[in-house]
Amino acid sequence: MVQAPQKTITLDEFLQLAETKPASEYIKGAIVQKPMPQGKHSTIQGELITRINAAGKPQRIAWAFPELRCTFGGRSIVPDVAIFLWNRIPLDADGEIANTFNAHPDWTIEILSPAQSQTKVTNNILHCLNAGGQMG
């Protein structure tokens, strides 16, 4: 079977599109939809976020966000868990957490699901590290 080539779009065009469920990511001009999280994936994600935030939020060290869109370095990705150091959390004009995160996470966690490409997940982690992330 012959597949038609996918039309590439710009990052700005991608960001104007409606959000999808599960989330879609913009990688090298292409839209790649993440698989729908299953029970085990969601359990691991929830436990990680709960424990990281229990340690990091009270002391205002870091905050873990689930499925947060992070746009930086020509890509727009949605890590399973994105952890930002407190002083790097984007704020809006009212001093509240911004809706848009145009920065790399300090830590990125991807929970590999059976339907995911290990190469794609690894490349997203490397993209975060190359942009200045501390751990992935």
Listing of model-derived features with the role each one plays in the protein:
Residues M1-M135:
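Gly/Pro/Ser/Thr-rich low-complexity, intrinsically disordered segments predominantly at protein N-termini
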